[in-house]
């Protein structure tokens, strides 16, 4: 059951989504400390465990590092062909690396591939310095963007995801961040499907082992530290639907792969997503007092999708909550009522 606000549809606003929760569909039994599965089109949570608990994100931090790099490219503050110098500090970055040489020049395109495919901490550092001048200033940008996205359980201390006090996120926040990358930067999202990258004559393979194993999986990012455990945020598209899954502290590389696969299969096999209303559909005529017209049409400003368990679409019911007449003047785009979605019985 869910409530969603109706708006006066003649003003373009963000499209609305709905969630219809049905406890009769049991999620797979996973050992991961936290997990989350979301249908991207309807923004519906299909399975979750500890999704709002603050966790150490490890290299999933690099989702935000990449996001800010994509934003800089979009704003033409960077270009993929631009070459930047590798600092001594970046070269000394511990952990996973793309094996940059200090003082050498490297293109932004190669840095992005090293960041995404090889999870290079050195690549993250060079990108941070190229965008903000220093990693410290880049972290300020990361946290500012997290606040703008309303990632309420996220705080960054570095651009790499190396363990640090007060460096944390949550499964829900990371899925929201990944969703924004997919929606805003489709031309760069394709980098997450690369299975191999060769730099400095060293070939490294994408640690997301679902790539190639499941033809529907086309990204996104792994993470690991001793304290964070094995993490994987994955996304797949099948029959026009896109799902995003995340597992935190799965126990092993093999486990994070298999548990992510279980989540994605569960979402595709047990649920369907359909359009309930199209943009501009008149859902209801709202009475208006003391206006130039006695009624105003109300609906959703964007296509309105609903995800339901397989076989239950015909049982779905949409009811308007009791609404009082509006008093003119009425502001276009204002929320004017609630739509309740339920199943019969």
Where are these regions (language model features)?
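Compositionally biased, intrinsically disordered/low-complexity regions enriched for serine, proline
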Residues: 12, 24-25, 306
């Amino acid at each position: 059951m869910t409530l969603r606000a109706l708006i006066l549809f003649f003003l373009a606003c963000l499209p609305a989504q709905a969630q219809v929760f049905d406890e009769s569909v049991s999620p797979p039994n996973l050992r991961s400390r936290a997990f989350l599965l979301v249908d991207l089109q309807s923004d519906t949570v299909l399975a979750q465990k500890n999704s709002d608990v603050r966790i150490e994100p490890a290299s999933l931090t690099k989702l935000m590092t990449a996001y800010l790099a994509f934003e800089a490219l979009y704003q033409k503050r960077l270009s993929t062909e631009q070459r930047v110098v590798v600092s001594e500090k970046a070269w000394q970055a511990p952990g996973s690396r793309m094996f940059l040489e200090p003082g050498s020049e490297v293109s932004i395109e190669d840095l992005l591939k090293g960041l995404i495919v090889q999870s290079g901490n050195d690549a993250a550092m060079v990108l941070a310095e190229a965008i903000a001048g220093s990693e410290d200033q880049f972290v300020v940008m990361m946290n500012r963007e997290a606040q703008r996205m309303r990632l309420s359980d996220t705080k960054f201390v570095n651009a790499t995801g190396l363990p640090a006090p007060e460096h944390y996120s949550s499964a829900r926040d990371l899925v929201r961040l990944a969703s924004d990358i997919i929606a805003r930067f489709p031309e760069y999202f394709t980098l997450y499907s690369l299975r191999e990258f060769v730099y400095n004559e060293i070939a490294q393979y994408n640690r997301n082992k679902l790539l190639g194993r499941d033809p529907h999986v086309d990204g996104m990012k792994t993470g690991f530290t001793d304290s964070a455990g094995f993490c994987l945020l994955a996304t797949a598209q099948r029959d026009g639907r896109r799902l995003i899954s995340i597992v935190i502290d799965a126990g092993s590389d093999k486990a994070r792969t298999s548990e992510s696969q279980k989540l994605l299969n569960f979402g595709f096999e047990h649920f369907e997503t359909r359009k309930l209303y199209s943009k501009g559909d008149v859902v209801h005529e709202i009475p208006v007092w003391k206006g130039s017209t006695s009624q105003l049409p109300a609906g959703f400003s964007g296509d309105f999708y609903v995800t339901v368990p397989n076989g239950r679409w015909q049982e779905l019911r949409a009811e308007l909550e009791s609404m009082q007449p509006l008093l003119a003047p009425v502001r276009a785009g204002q929320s004017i009522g609630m739509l309740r979605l339920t199943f019969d019985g």
